[in-house]
Structures are given as structure tokens and as C-alpha cells.
Curated annotation (Swiss-Prot):
Positions contributing to substrate binding: 88, 94, 126-129, 154-157, 235
Name used for this protein in its record: L-lactate dehydrogenase
Subcellular location: Cytoplasm
Annotated positions binding beta-D-fructose 1,6-bisphosphate: 159, 174
Pfam families: Ldh_1_C (PF02866), Ldh_1_N (PF00056)
GO function terms (MF aspect): L-lactate dehydrogenase activity
A GO CC term attached to the entry: cytoplasm
Entry's Gene Ontology BP terms: glycolytic process; lactate metabolic process
Catalytic activity: (S)-lactate + NAD(+) = pyruvate + NADH + H(+)
Oligomeric and partner information: Homotetramer.
Organism: Streptococcus thermophilus (strain ATCC BAA-250 / LMG 18311)
Domain of life: Bacteria
Length: 328
């Protein structure tokens, strides 16, 4: 995709709670000129209904072609967004979903590639770091053109939690969650800042904020998905808007720095997996990772998170079906 392209096309694979919320976010924000929605055959009519429903919002936003799509419609798409997968149930971790969702991912990616698609993959199905890796393996695409939503939502949750604790606008909070999008993620406290002021320095004027409260704050961020799932069954609004933000950065060639699931080539001593860290993203995918200098404790947490993901991938790739389908 070139930065000057006027007609930008997105194909969404998966019209569940996350997918339909993402489609609504795209319409609301006027992102892309064409949106196709792919669903499994037995849910095709739902995609037709959602496309029709969304089209009725267009007079309030901006023109867009919206329709229930088939895999052949991916051929000239700029971006394919994968939200399809088995949902995370109460009591399940994201990593519990590996077996079910790898098989689904393989089927999706194979059909997208067979269409002649030559754009960028954006993966949001969980466990997202593992499924971003499998999308790369099954597609044979360059690593720069396979992106996972990574810790984009986690970092937003972190910023919002800090903003509420410190009574400032979340847009003035600059802080990242890195590592797995899941239980082994960690907060990069050493580089958190409020409008350029290091968090530790900022807290000197916040006498009522104790260190124990910050530990509790991070735990709330890390466990937010479980809290929401237990209360309403699924998380979808936050991740939908995160995906819309990533989509805009790609389609508008923003070269924005966002926390994404990015291929590792030695940064932080990690290799050959996708894991959450900030990266510059634009029209051609990942421009380059942004390697925040971690302190020793954070570095250890990054390595531990990567080791956990690597163990899951190694176990999954013992399956001959996945080995045979791998192109990278």
C-alpha cells in the first residue's frame, strides 16, 4: 500500500463481539473507504445484517462501502484484520485457547493468502502473540507485514488507571505495558511519565499515593480482562478502539509509535517470537521496533514472558499439521 492511495480497503475476519465492535469503530471514525466482513458460512447472514446495520450510520459519518465478504475479496485489500477465534471463557487464560485457535487461524490465513492478498495482517484473536506468530508462519509473509495488537489495550488500561489515580488526562500519561498480552505482562515503570515528567519525580508532589497502591494498580490492569469477562462475558470495546487506532496508523502511513506484538530479532535477548513492545507502524507495516532501555528487573520480566510464549509455541509446533503448513 502506498501512502498516497485514496481508496483504502479493510477485510475483517470474524464478526463476533470484537469484530463487530471494531467495524462500528471504523464507521464511527471514518476510517477506510471499504470494509468487507467475513464470517463462517453458518453465520454469513449475521455478517449481511451487520453490514446493513452499519451502512445506516454512514449518513452521520463518511461514505464507505460495507458488505458481507468472501475470502476472494481479500485479493486487493490493504489490511486483513483477524478477530475470529474461540472466545475466552470465565476461568480460562488466553494461553488456554492455543489449541482451538491455532487450527482456526491456520484455516483463515491459508484462505486469505490463496486469494492473492498482498497487504498487511493485523491479528487480535487470543492468545494474540502466539497467533501473530502462527499467522507469520502460515502466510510466509515478511515479519514487517504481520502485526499483533499486542499490549496496545494493556497499555491503554495502564494509562487510564494512572490517569484516574493521579487525576490527570490519560492523554498526558505516557506509559507502556510490555511482554505477553496476558498473565506474564509487566509495566515499564522506569519510563512512565506524566507530560514528560518521570513518574517517580511526579509522585513527589502526590503525597497520598503509596507504592503498594501502584502495585495494586498494575495488578488491576493485568487482570482487567478477567474482571470484565466475569462481569459481562467478554471484552470488546477497548480492543475494538485499539484496533481502529492501529488501522488508522497503517492506512494513513502515520509512522505512529504503538505497543504491538512485534517480531524479535535479539532485542531484549529474545529471538524468533512475537511479543509486545513499542514499534513504529505505517503503510508498509512495522517500520522498526522502538527498544525502550529496560532496567534489570524489567529485563528479567521480559525474558520470563518471552520464555513462556516460546514454550507454548514449541509445544504447539509438535503438531505435524502446523509444521507442514509453515512457510516461514
Amino acid at each position: 500500500m502506498t501512502a498516497t492511495k485514496l481508496h483504502k480497503k479493510v477485510i475483517l475476519v470474524g464478526d463476533g463481539a470484537v469484530g463487530s465492535s471494531y467495524a462500528f469503530a471504523l464507521v464511527n471514525q471514518g476510517i477506510a473507504q471499504e470494509l468487507g466482513i467475513i464470517e463462517i458460512p453458518q453465520l454469513f447472514e449475521k455478517a449481511v445484517g451487520d453490514a446493513l446495520d452499519l451502512s445506516h450510520a454512514l449518513p452521520f459519518t463518511s461514505p464507505k462501502k460495507i458488505y458481507a465478504a468472501k475470502y476472494e475479496d481479500c485479493a486487493d485489500a490493504d489490511l486483513v484484520v483477524i478477530t475470529a477465534g474461540a472466545p475466552q471463557k470465565p476461568g480460562e487464560t488466553r494461553l488456554d485457547l492455543v489449541g482451538k485457535n491455532l487450527a482456526i487461524n491456520k484455516s483463515i490465513v491459508t484462505q486469505v493468502v490463496e486469494s492473492g492478498f498482498n497487504g498487511i495482517f493485523l491479528v487480535a484473536a487470543n492468545p494474540v502473540d502466539v497467533l501473530t506468530y502462527s499467522t507469520w508462519k502460515f502466510s510466509g509473509f515478511p515479519k514487517e507485514r504481520v502485526i499483533g495488537s499486542g499490549t496496545s489495550l494493556d497499555s491503554a488500561r495502564f494509562r487510564q488507571a494512572l490517569a484516574e489515580k493521579l487525576n490527570v488526562d490519560a492523554r498526558s500519561v505516557h506509559a507502556y505495558i510490555m511482554g505477553e498480552h496476558g498473565d506474564s505482562e509487566f509495566a515499564v515503570w522506569s519510563h512512565a511519565n506524566i507530560a514528560g515528567v518521570n513518574l517517580e519525580e511526579f509522585l513527589k508532589d502526590e503525597e497520598n499515593v503509596q507504592e503498594a497502591e501502584l502495585v495494586e494498580l498494575f495488578e488491576g490492569v493485568r487482570d482487567a480482562a478477567y474482571t470484565i469477562i466475569n462481569k459481562k462475558g467478554a471484552t470488546y470495546y477497548g480492543i475494538a478502539v485499539a484496533l481502529a487506532r492501529i488501522t488508522k496508523a497503517i492506512l494513513d502511513d502515520e509512522n505512529a509509535v504503538l505497543p504491538l506484538s512485534v517480531f524479535q530479532e535479539g532485542q531484549y535477548g529474545v529471538n524468533n517470537i512475537f511479543i509486545g513492545q513499542p514499534a513504529i507502524v505505517g503503510a508498509h507495516g512495522i517500520v522498526r521496533p522502538v527498544n525502550i532501555p529496560l532496567n534489570d528487573a524489567e529485563q528479567q520480566k521480559m525474558k520470563a514472558s518471552a520464555d513462556e510464549l516460546q514454550a507454548i509455541i514449541d509445544e504447539a509446533w509438535k503438531n505435524p499439521e502446523f509444521q507442514e503448513a509453515s512457510k516461514n
